[in-house]
Amino acid sequence: MTDLFRFVNEGWLATHAIPDDRPIDGTFYQLRDQAELDVYEIVKNSPDSRAGKLFHSFMDTEAIETAGIAPLDPDLQLIDAVTSVDELVTAFVKLCRTGVDVPVGAYVAKDSGSDDAIPYLAQAGLGLPDEAYYREPMHQQTLAAYQQHVGTMLAFLGLDATAAEQVVALEKDIAAGHWDVVSTRDAVKTYNPTALADLPGPVRDLMVGILQGTTDKVIARMPSFLDHVAGLLTADRLDDWKLWAKWHVLRGRAGLLTDEISQANFAFYGTVLTGTPVQRDRWKRGLDLANGYVGQEIGQLFVAKHFPESSKTEMVELVDYLVKAYHERISQLSWMTPATRERALEKLAKFQAKIGYPDKWRDYTGLEFESDGSALVENVRRGSAFLHDYELNKVSKPFDRSEWFSTPQTVNAFYNPTVNDITFPAAILRPPFYSPDADAAENFGAIGAVIGHEIGHGFDDQGSQYDGDGNLHSWWSDEDRAAFTERTAKLVDQFQGLVPTSVREAGIETTGVNGEFTLGENIGDLGGLGIAIVAYRMYLADRGLTLADTPTRPFVAEGGSPELTKHEFSGLQRLFLAWSHVWRSKTRPELDVQLMASDPHSPSEFRCNVIAGNVAELYEAFEVPADAPMFIAPENRVTIW
């Protein structure tokens, strides 16, 4: 074994063409395709539901084309009427409630210092994925294309190229106050309880308007950014801000307007930024819209049709094995002192799992949509206002730990450090991640490792700073934190500067993977795979078996290497092969560049191979030559949990 990722995925990587309407494809996206078809059947057959009406309004292209740019008039007139900074802030308050970006982001979550829900304030205000795009030389070509794109779009509003120059110049100034991606991950630095009255002038006024008297305290995630953007909200920049606001109205609503406007916006955000040649089919984009506003209404029907209760029962058993495996490993850690080990076990004991679907569905009473395409933008305003008010209603009340923040039809998994729970929506609990008919080794190597990954986030470089109740305070001794950091530093070094195949073959300039930025996800992956193996051993032991007792069987994964089809594999080997199959993925190089700048996950090929190379059992399962790219010498392998 020289390359686990390609051993399982080589044929698929060589022959599979990424569909023209997406920048990435693989196992996650194949599951999303299936969930999308399932949701389409639900929405199509429920024309009088909220989802059905919203979907129909998006599909009514004749009315949308007739309406042209006019649906934006209420937003644009609001901005045109602004004559002072105070009026600008008032306009931002109204725009924010109806789904338009404003210079400061705000969301409601559990307070990391109490059990209440509280607003968190974050940096915002950019039209590019990250502040690095405005300052790093390797992104200057993209920045120039962005300015040209802003000009193209603002022409739909009758504005000239000078307006685009003003918008991008202001965004450069906004970006200068943004924290970098590594700093924004720091749980301690980004937790700053602040009195509303102590926020800098214009930001205070903005938040007073948005929060409507629900609280006198917020959490400032990036305090210096709030000071910075407040310093830009001045009378001499008023014209710049009004143009900026018009741009963000148009940018945010472009997909709801005529095909010409929608395609023009996609030409940059789809093609330039991600390399995607064509937009997704309209019905798919319509489903995205419906899922975004009434996803749990759809999810209730999705679960009834596509998620048997037996799958939930079996997943609970799998989670139990993973938790027991973590308990065993933590109990045996030689690098952690007994007192800290005990506190880690206390946190693990408080861990909760949400599987499949919520016990209580969201109530959408009061939200109504119209089916006509001429009402599409207004439908989105209504939906945004409903969700805005829904979140605002939580503030200063005990946080509801049972609430789901995703839909059952979402193909993903989540760990929430402020609640200490994981969420596994129904749509991810399908092959190749999970199947009730699959061999246990394959389920542990796929969904088991993903479960282990999510639990592992509770013990990664940031999650480990929260206790079992989701509160942010140090439960580590200095000695233990130093030992932890020593181990994680090796993982940072292993990933630092790695360049994904797509980018290398395209000859695109890049600094590669940022090992510090991706550390949390890499810790999650490392713990996930290692703990999945421990859990699989426990599963076998409960049945009176060991790894040596597992039968050899073929591993079925269409698109593997020729060698994959020639052999049968032990249980441990199939666990690793299932791990590799999960990470099957191809990405356009433009998207890989964007993700390395803004996404804390490493590229899939490295999540598979570098992580597996650190796990001792890989070398028991396969013969890995010392000169193989994925071989890691024993003294350099990282084991944390």
Can you describe what each PLM-predicted range is?
Residues E10-A14, N45-D48, I64, D101, ...:
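Intrinsically disordered or highly flexible coil/loop and linker segments, enriched in small
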Residues M1-A14, Y134-L154, L519, L526-I531:
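Hydrophobic/aromatic-rich, well-ordered segments within soluble, folded domains that form packed cores
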Residues M1-D3, F7-T66:
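Active-site-surrounding "flap" and adjacent substrate/cofactor-binding loops of secreted or lumenal enzymes
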Residues I18, P23-T27, L31, I42, ...:
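Gly/Pro-rich cap/lid or specificity-loop segments adjacent to the active site
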Residues D20-V43, A161-G177, N443-A449, E563, ...:
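Short secondary-structure subsegments characteristic of cysteine-rich extracellular domains
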Residues M1-F28, D130, D421, A426-I428, ...:
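His/Glu-rich zincin catalytic helix
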Residues V43-Y321:
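Noncatalytic, helix-rich "gating/capping" subdomain that lines the substrate-entry/channel surface
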Residues L31, A35-D38, E87-T98, V316-G448, ...:
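Zinc-dependent metallohydrolase catalytic domains
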